[in-house]
Design a protein with these regions (language model features):
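Sequence-structural signature of mature extracellular/luminal beta-sheet repeat domains
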Residues: 1-311
């Protein structure tokens, strides 16, 4: 993968810690969710306000075609929130009679069909490192039809995370954080219902993703690949469990960087990006293009940030 350089970054403080994802609505307002469950709106004028509250930790989100904000929470499942009143409704809290404890990201098609990921069936967000270390491959991709029926499309994914639709609507692109891989789930054409790998052996762990105005797939690289975590992946499950039982300071750690990469949606080539270290921002977990700027969110800092969209 090419080496990408720094960019001029503007950091915007949030009224709380760890805004995990960031999305934009049709009116130009940005939305994010804090670790304590507060849902925050950043208006086109830059004014920051708290609009709602979730009981679980808000993670990936998207603006639905009916105007509501779809929010993945852990625990809690998939919610829909009225962006004016802050009222929330549970859309999915279980799949195949199992609690949806780690809903990770969500996207909606124009016909109202919703797709969402679950990172792991065992852990919640509070213990996400356990899923990475144990490397069970128990994440999944699901579809919620407009009538409310939920169908499992894919399972055995290695920490399924970011999810976006391609600009032409022919496929979904999803990220596997522990697998360090981007894949396409085809929605139309002769390959419909099948999966092809878009990019693999990534130099960092991908988190949330989004589709840019030109169709490029923007990927939040939450942390560079960790040699210790890589070495654990093929080991016996009992050894991985022992490592997970160690004190946090002895486990593989996240390296705080500002790291985001754009991939060609057809070839999987890395075509643009930004990478740098800052004392006031890093650990990028979400990103979205908005008015020529690349906005980024982070679980490591009480802020979001933005820079010019890299060419």
């Amino acid at each position: 993968m090419p080496e990408f350089g720094p960019a001029e970054l503007i950091v915007v403080p949030m009224p709380g810690d760890a805004p995990e994802d960031i999305v934009v609505d049709a009116g130009g307002a940005l939305w994010t969710g804090l670790v304590d469950g507060r849902i925050v709106r950043i208006g086109p004028d830059g004014m920051v306000s708290v609009v709602g509250q979730t009981t679980g930790r808000p993670l990936g989100m998207t603006v639905a075609h009916d105007g509501r904000l779809l929010i993945c929470t852990s625990p809690g499942g998939l919610l829909a929130m009225d962006r004016t009143t802050g009222h929330t409704e549970v859309l999915v809290d279980a799949v195949d009679f199992r609690p949806l404890n780690f809903c990770s990201n969500v996207v909606e098609l124009p016909d109202g069909t919703i797709f969402f990921t679950q990172s792991t069936a065992k852990f919640t967000y509070a213990n996400f490192k356990g899923a990475i270390i144990e490397a069970r491959g128990d994440g999944g991709l699901f579809r919620r039809d407009p009538d409310g029926r939920v169908i499992t499309l894919l399972d055995h994914l290695y920490f399924a995370n970011g999810l976006t639709a391609t600009l032409d609507g022919t496929a979904l692109v999803f990220a596997e954080t522990q697998g360090r891989r981007l894949s396409k789930y085809w929605l139309t054409g002769p390959q419909a219902g099948t999966v092809t790998v878009l990019a693999e052996h990534l130099p960092a762990m991908p988190d949330n993703i989004s589709t840019g105005s030109d169709g490029r797939i923007w990927v939040a690289m939450v942390t560079p690949r960790n040699a210790a975590a890589d070495a654990l992946a093929p080991r016996a499950p009992v050894l991985r469990k022992l490592v997970w039982a160690l004190p946090d300071r002895m486990q593989p750690q996240i390296v705080p960087e500002v790291y985001a990469v754009a991939f060609d949606p057809d070839t999987g080539a890395a075509v643009a990006g930004v990478r740098m270290k800052r004392p006031d921002f890093g650990v990028v977990t979400g990103l979205v293009e908005h008015r020529g700027r690349l906005w980024m969110s982070s679980i490591g800092f009480p802020a979001v940030a933005h820079c010019a969209v890299p060419a």
